[in-house]
């Protein structure tokens, strides 16, 4: 093959490679970053001001919506993942890292971690901002284990969380959970 015929063949190949690299870069940038919690953030279900509630929070980013859906409890955010109300493709879910929180009353405005990467304590004595049993997120397994030692519960990843822990009616007198069925979520992360 001479140089003259090789050039026209190599040019389309180079363009295809460049376009595929752009497409991959665009897909990676489609995941929105966490939004810092502000005084205007209202709960998706309750429309109450999120900052007025203690405990960890969740923000769920859904394709086609410019702002995240806010939840005053992580449990509520995880329930949204499996609810029939789910409005579309979930791009990413962020939760407060309680290992970086100032206190239970003040979990922080900017210490967000991806739910997919978090370790959760399920079935502890912790109550969330709405008074229901809370599913408590941590960036590290060690942080979650330390919390579980003090408050009870079991350390789990997102996919290990029991369906009953997020979708069953809330018993405000008990924090036990049935771990027979696990929550499988579809998040585009």
Model-derived features: positions:
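Positively charged n-region of N-terminal signal peptides that target proteins for export
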Residues: 1-5
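Bacterial N-terminal signal peptides
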Residues: 8-20
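Bacterial signal peptide processing site
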Residues: 22-25
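Short, intrinsically disordered, charge-biased short linear motifs at domain edges
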Residues: 27-35
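Post-signal-peptide N-terminal segment of Sec-exported extracytoplasmic proteins
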Residues: 35-70, 75
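Mid-length scaffold segments of soluble, non-membrane domains
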Residues: 67-106, 111-112
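Beta-strand-rich cores of mature extracytoplasmic or soluble domains
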Residues: 105-160
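C-terminal partner/receptor-binding element of secreted or periplasmic proteins
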Residues: 139-189
